[in-house]
């Protein structure tokens, strides 16, 4: 095993897939000469040349759509959208085209493409650059949506996404690029394994008192919460990392809730109509008789994200707010008095 | 620039002067292969009758949804498709029935798609707006205005990536030249040297909004100039003119590996779709759109008759065979089975993965 950053896991895996398959190419703004806004594509232009590392004008609808069209002819584009906020410019091509072409034409042509894009608040980027709108894509049949939280997941899930024949929205996170984690030594070239499976959640940490569910950055925050509560309060938290937002692996978190009897969901998006709402609804349907307390959601404050640091910090869910929700839930259950 | 006819980009009324220039010199016909001319005529008439049958089937509720016809655009459709090789790719908007047939799809299966049947080209999943066939490389009719443009550029990018000599043709209506995808796509097509021909079928009306109402530059063929894309305008009522202009640009795109723009103007004989009575048109405009002198099938038939290529007998024979084939298509569609409901989840994903939802509306989320 070695310890690498989430960024390096993505970069090395992307490179390895480009070496493996000539049909894989990368396309997006500032990915070549500039080497990527977040340096995921560093070195690729030098190694593969401009044909396979295609810098684009600032024209998200145009280049995302062009990637879709090239995928219809069998290329396997990996699109980089500088942030998920900019996907709104390309949303017609993602939802009305990439997601529809396979079904709408009776299964004649698949669209094997990946759209890599980071979400994530907390960087003082203000209202239009701090949104987490993966929900829009998770809502759409025909798309697959993946959200890795660790370097190991980032590597194996990116590989799975590139090798999949359907359009995959691959959610990264600004706050995770520098995070480190263990990966197998041959991570970049490894064949698919269980970590990578699209449509499967994972139990990131076993526990018995309560289930804490998150994805992407919030899965890593969930692990921190679990560790802290174990140490400080002797609370045993089971952490479920969703990994795949569509398809959604309901069974994994429902099984966990059946074991623990209660659940808190932490999400970086807004609460109302958010991904947590779907998780909570699924829990009540799948584990109604096992629930000892209402399912709680910890989510962003429902405001356009402010710039000023104290306001931004207050708006975001974090270790403190999640811990509070867990302790309140367990108090209600009567297991603990928080 | 082929700019002999000069639509002012507005209502049909505003550009009525075109009619006086519309009579084509038939001398060019003498140099053409008579059988090839008759073939063009037969194909145009086929689209005319096919679309009339489609309209009828729609009003009989055999066809549902939105349904846009190529009536009045037969010369444009046939002329454009005559310029493509079988291996060239085609993307169109939702007014796609004629293109699908002309690109090589079996009309029976096109009609079956309109009927939403199992034997339809898209197995009944697409309908009128979404004809598609990988074999004939008609890569889709698209319902979102402008949506097909980036896709077509992407197909051309793949052609360029693989260094084959295919060309992509991307058809659209006049209204499309105002949407963002137009500008983004033309820019990248030129920037990346893509072998693609953009074709604007200008019938002067985007639904009910005229080109004058919507385009600050109503000479649509000029609208590639911001991207240094050469444009031409052609009389879309003239099948030979369309064929020649399209062939020239398609071959230049193939040779020079760069995009071109062709504007073909003609009349939309009926409303925007089958159900649109076109009340926004004056009687004069309606008369003009349906006038014999603007009817591409009538124009070409008369030219061929004058040139002694098409006899009265030949005309009847072609009409009878077209009628028969259209009837066959309708019969085929009528007798094709509806898609089986058990196939509902077959085309959501190409690569199966765990936890795909196969839940019917009343099913619980957890089936067991």
Where are these regions (language model features)?
Chain B
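Conserved acidic/glycine
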Residues: 1-76, 270, 278-368
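Mixed-charge, polar/low-complexity N-terminal
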Residues: 25-26, 31, 38-39, 43, ...
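Cofactor-binding active-site loop characterized by glycine-rich and histidine/acidic residues
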Residues: 52-56, 60-192, 210-216, 221, ...
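Alpha-helix initiation/capping motif
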Residues: 85, 106, 116, 219, ...
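A general secondary-structure junction signal
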Residues: 94, 264-266, 348
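Short acidic, gly/pro-rich beta-turn/loop elements at beta-sheet edges
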Residues: 100-102, 208, 272, 343
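Glycine-rich ThDP/TPP pyrophosphate-binding loop and its adjacent helix/strand module
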Residues: 138-335
């Amino acid at each position: 095993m070695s310890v690498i950053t989430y960024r390096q896991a993505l970069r090395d895996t992307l490179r390895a897939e480009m070496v493996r398959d000539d049909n894989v190419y990368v396309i997006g703004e500032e990915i070549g000469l500039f080497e990527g806004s977040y340096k995921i594509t560093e070195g690729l232009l030098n190694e593969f040349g401009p044909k396979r590392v295609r810098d684009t004008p600032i024209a998200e609808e145009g280049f995302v759509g062009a990637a879709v069209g090239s995928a219809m002819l069998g290329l396997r584009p990996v699109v980089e959208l500088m942030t998920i906020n900019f996907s709104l410019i390309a949303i017609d091509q993602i939802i009305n085209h990439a997601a529809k072409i396979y079904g709408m034409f009776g299964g004649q042509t698949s669209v094997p493409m990946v759209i890599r894009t980071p979400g994530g608040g907390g960087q003082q980027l203000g209202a239009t650059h701090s949104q987490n709108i993966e929900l829009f894509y998770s809502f759409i049949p025909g798309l697959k949506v993946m959200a890795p939280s660790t370097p190991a997941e980032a590597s194996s899930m990116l590989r799975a996404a590139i090798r999949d024949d359907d359009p995959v929205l691959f959610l990264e996170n600004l706050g995770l690029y520098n995070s480190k984690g263990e990966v197998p030594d041959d991570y970049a070239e490894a064949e698919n394994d269980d970590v990578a499976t699209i449509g499967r959640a994972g139990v990131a940490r076993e526990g018995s008192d309560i289930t804490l569910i998150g994805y992407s950055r919030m899965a890593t925050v969930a692990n921190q919460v679990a560790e802290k509560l174990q140490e400080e309060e002797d609370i045993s938290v089971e952490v479920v990392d969703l990994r795949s937002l569509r398809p959604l692996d309901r069974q994994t978190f429902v099984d966990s809730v059946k074991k623990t009897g209660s659940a808190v969901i932490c999400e970086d998006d807004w609460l109302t109509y958010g991904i947590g709402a779907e998780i909570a609804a699924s829990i009540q349907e799948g584990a109604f008789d096992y629930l000892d307390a209402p399912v709680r959601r910890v989510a962003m404050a429902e405001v356009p994200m402010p710039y000023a640091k104290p306001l931004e910090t207050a708006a975001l869910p974090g270790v403190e707010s999640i811990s509070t929700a867990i302790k309140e839930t367990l108090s209600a259950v009567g297991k603990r008095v928080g | 620039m082929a700019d002999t006819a000069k639509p002012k980009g507005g209502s049909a009324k505003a550009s009525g002067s075109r009619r006086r220039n519309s009579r084509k010199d038939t001398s060019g016909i003498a140099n053409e292969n008579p059988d090839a001319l008759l073939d063009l005529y037969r194909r145009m008439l086929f689209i005319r009758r096919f679309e009339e049958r489609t309209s009828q089937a729609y009003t009989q509720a055999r066809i549902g949804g939105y349904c846009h016809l190529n009536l009045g655009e037969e010369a444009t459709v046939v002329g454009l498709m005559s310029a493509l090789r079988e291996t060239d790719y085609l993307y169109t908007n939702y007014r796609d029935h004629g293109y699908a047939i002309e690109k090589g799809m079996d009309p029976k299966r096109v009609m079956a798609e309109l009927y939403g049947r199992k034997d339809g080209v898209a197995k009944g999943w697409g309908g009128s707006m979404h004809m598609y066939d990988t074999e004939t490389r008609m890569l889709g009719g698209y319902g979102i205005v402008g949506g097909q443009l980036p896709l077509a550029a992407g197909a051309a990018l793949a052609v360029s990536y693989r260094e084959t000599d295919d060309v992509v043709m991307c058809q659209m209506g006049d209204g499309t030249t105002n949407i963002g995808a137009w500008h983004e796509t033309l820019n990248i097509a030129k920037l990346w040297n893509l072998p693609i021909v953009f074709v604007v079928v200008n019938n002067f009306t985007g639904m009910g909004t005229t080109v004058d109402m919507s385009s600050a530059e109503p000479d649509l063929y000029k609208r590639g100039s911001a991207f240094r894309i050469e444009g031409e305008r052609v009389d879309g009522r003239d099948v030979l003119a369309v064929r020649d202009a399209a062939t020239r640009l398609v071959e230049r795109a193939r040779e020079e590996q760069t995009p071109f723009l062709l504007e073909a103007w003609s009349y939309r004989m009926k409303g925007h779709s089958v159900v649109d009575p076109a009340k926004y048109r004056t009687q004069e405009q309606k008369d003009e759109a349906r006038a014999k002198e603007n009817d591409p099938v009538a124009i070409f038939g008369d030219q061929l008759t004058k040139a002694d290529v098409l006899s009265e007998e030949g005309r009847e024979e072609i009409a009878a065979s077209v009628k028969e084939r259209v009837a066959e298509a309708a019969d085929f569609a009528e007798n094709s089975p509806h898609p089986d409901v058990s196939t509902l989840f077959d085309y959501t994903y190409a690569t199966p993965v765990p936890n795909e939802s196969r839940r019917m509306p009343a099913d619980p989320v957890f089936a067991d």
